[in-house]
């Protein structure tokens, strides 16, 4: 059986935009790198249920989001919604409200777009974050993530201010702040992933290489810290920046990618999700593992390396969480986002 996986990334060197690859799950093999959409710097991508592809996009001196029709093979460009400044770094679809959310790292903004009948987008709200953190990389707000909580609120992670903000989404796409969780100072809050029970979340810190385990109170939309754990071995003292974080759908294992140590940190998750136990690290066979993802059956993990331009394929043991190398050095340039179909 062959599965298709979409890839987004930078177009600074050789990449032309969004690509696809095929995963043969019987042979444990990636093949057929194919260009899907020509777009500048689609560093994060997402699909809605109707087959619309939304990507971060640069456009001349501006940045924003691009929309495409995608039939599984080819794309038709539906248009860009851009403004002055750098492009987004994260995009997510809200199917229930027919909205798309975007995070703008450089401008410190959260943006909301309404999906139109033809799949194109209309900007409905922009919220500017303010503040800073103690590290040089935190001179101002840097919103790095904007996606839904299990109960349908919007949650954002701000790498510049170490804050996780929960919003109610009102009407046709207006945001109203509910709560602000303040992570460890200098953490660099990047992404958050929720346990399948919806009551626990895992916040990854790019700048201090940690994961904070958080309880989530749905009634109040409030986070509280339960545990902090490192993503690195004790004997590693080199540079590192954590990137992606994913939890298996059964809630048993959590993974995070280390850029610098160039590894996936693997954790066993307690039955209620409230505690992580480190069970080791697997080297990713490339440089700067910016993103990774499960295939749709979660038998495999595909790791994308932004700097070494390769994908690595691991077989995943669902009972132990451990990873076995199946393929490395599959060429895919400047990839920063892995999206299984």
Swiss-Prot record:
SUPFAM superfamilies recorded: C-terminal (heme d1) domain of cytochrome cd1-nitrite reductase
UniProt GO molecular function: 6-phosphogluconolactonase activity
Superkingdom to which the source organism belongs: Bacteria
GO cellular component terms, semicolon-separated: cytosol
Coiled coil: none
Residue segments, region Disordered: 125-146
InterPro entries for this protein: Cycloisomerase_2, Haem_d1_sf, Lactonase_7-beta_prop, WD40/YVTN_repeat-like_dom_sf
Protein family: Belongs to the cycloisomerase 2 family.
Name of this protein: Uncharacterized protein llmg_2431
